Amino acid sequence: MSLIKHLEYINKNPILKKSFEFGVEIIKLSKNIRIKYKEYSLADQLLRSGTSIGANANEAVIGSSKKDFINKMNISLKEAYESRYWLLLLASVDNIKNPDFYLDEIDEIIRMLVKIVKTSKETESAKK
């Protein structure tokens, strides 16, 4: 499948789209923090958690069961909370130029993931 087809697939799912776009921004931010501030450890922590959100959400969508879906989305949610922590920490020491942009984005992703997990759990419970 071509890059365009992959991106079309991602764009059809709101959480995949949002987490992919966030991941791209985090890659750029992490690179900038490493170059401008020489802060490698925290930039790497942010890079790992920020890109893991979309990776786990993507795994959830192609998961083998509803239980697997919920588990992977929960992991995405945990990674989102971790990303918010690193963003707050880096913003507190002035290593992020426009922290509100990133914090607004991660808060929106967290809201989306909380809703997905909650709805999925309720649907799963209703089946039992």
What are these regions (language model features)?
Residues 1-55, 59, 63-128:
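Short, C-terminally biased terminal segments at protein or domain edges
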